[in-house]
C-alpha cells in the first residue's frame, strides 16, 4: 500500500535502499563545475527544498557568488534512493538543491530571501499542484550560524505573511543537514537541457523583509 502523500513514512517502514550511490558523471551544465568535488575552502554549503527541484535549482545557478548547484534527495531514511523511490513517498526524502556559494559575494540572507519569496512555505507536504512528502519546504544547514539565521528568517517571513493577512503557519522544516544523495544525471540542471520543461514554482507575492 502506498503511504499517505501528506504524512512522512516511519523510519522502520522506509525502503531499505542500497549501498551503491549515484555519482554524477557530467559536469554542471551551466558553469562546468564537477558536481561531486569537495567544495573549495572558505566556501559555504546549504541545502534547500521548495517543491520540484528542477525549477528550484534554476533560481540559483546563475547568481553571482554561486559556485555550484546540484539536485538530490535529503531528509529521509533510505540510503542512496532513486528518483522513483523518492516519488513513491517510501523514503522520507525531499527533493532538494545543494548550493555551494562564496559568502563574500552572496550572503545567506540573499539566498534565503529568494527561497522564501519563490515558493509557498505554508503548504505542508505539497507545493502547488505537486503533492507528496518529497515536495515539502526544507532548509538543511551545515553550520550553527546558518541554523540560527534560517530559524530567524522563518520568523521574519511569518511576520511578513501575517502583515499581508496571510496567517497560515509556515511549515518549512529547518534542521542540520544529514546526508545529501545526488539525483540521477537526467535531473541535474534539467531546465537547461529542457528549456520548456515543467516548473511548478510559485510564491505568495509577499516580500521577505529582514528584521
From Swiss-Prot:
GO terms for MF: L-methionine-(S)-S-oxide reductase activity; peptide-methionine (S)-S-oxide reductase activity
E.C. number: 1.8.4.11
Keyword terms of this UniProt record: Oxidoreductase
Any single GO CC term annotated in Swiss-Prot or TrEMBL for this entry: cytoplasm
Superkingdom, taxonomy of origin: Bacteria
Keyword DNA repair part of the UniProt annotation: no
Keyword field contains Glycosyltransferase: no
Reaction equations catalysed: L-methionyl-[protein] + [thioredoxin]-disulfide + H2O = L-methionyl-(S)-S-oxide-[protein] + [thioredoxin]-dithiol; [thioredoxin]-disulfide + L-methionine + H2O = L-methionine (S)-S-oxide + [thioredoxin]-dithiol
UniProt GO BP: cellular response to oxidative stress; protein modification process
Active site positions, chain numbering: 52
InterPro entries: Met_Sox_Rdtase_MsrA_dom, Met_Sox_Rdtase_MsrA_sf, MsrA_MetSO_reductase
Function: Has an important function as a repair enzyme for proteins that have been inactivated by oxidation. Catalyzes the reversible oxidation-reduction of methionine sulfoxide in proteins to methionine.
Family: Belongs to the MsrA Met sulfoxide reductase family.
PANTHER family listed in its UniProt record: MITOCHONDRIAL PEPTIDE METHIONINE SULFOXIDE REDUCTASE
Descriptive protein name: Peptide methionine sulfoxide reductase MsrA
Gene transcribed to yield this protein: msrA
